């Protein structure tokens, strides 16, 4: 593990599980320990970009605390916009009913149906009039969909990314969302790229991560 500050890595991973293991390894070995604004101690690596070539096989890492039932419910809420557990917000609500006005996923589908080479098929979660005044704000900020080489590819930006606890669920849900959009547009789902501005592991997950990354290159 290093204490010096380092910023920026690009990783090409085969699957979601591969992406998780390699991301954890980078944060564990090259991240810097800081105390965040809530007083939590984290090990953080900034600007971590991971390209997942096949996010549809080996979606659930063996070591994650998320089981398939919970992951399916997470994906369902992401795609449908439902909030059955009365959270302050869900990503699905922000994507399907942004500020009570816009279904951004419908917009993405229509945009790509009308113009397959569009660079405007984007959905955002941040609502400035709301999120500048509350404590609970989205970590996932932007989903960008592009059709290239006969497939829809998704690039997702996270301002803050809990790699130890949330990455497997985030990517499981995003892979299901990409499959949904691809089906509606009538093309094949492609790669998923995550850009994590603050990729971090909370101190309560350090021991777990230590065991997971043994043997990871």
UniProtKB/Swiss-Prot annotation:
One of its GO terms (molecular function) is thymidylate synthase activity. It comes from the Archaea. Pathway: Pyrimidine metabolism; dTTP biosynthesis. One of its GO terms (biological process) is dTMP biosynthetic process. Keywords: Cytoplasm, Methyltransferase, Nucleotide biosynthesis, Transferase. Pfam families: Thymidylat_synt. It is found in: Cytoplasm. Monomer. Belongs to the thymidylate synthase family. Archaeal-type ThyA subfamily. This is Putative thymidylate synthase. It comes from Methanosarcina barkeri (strain Fusaro / DSM 804). The gene is thyA.
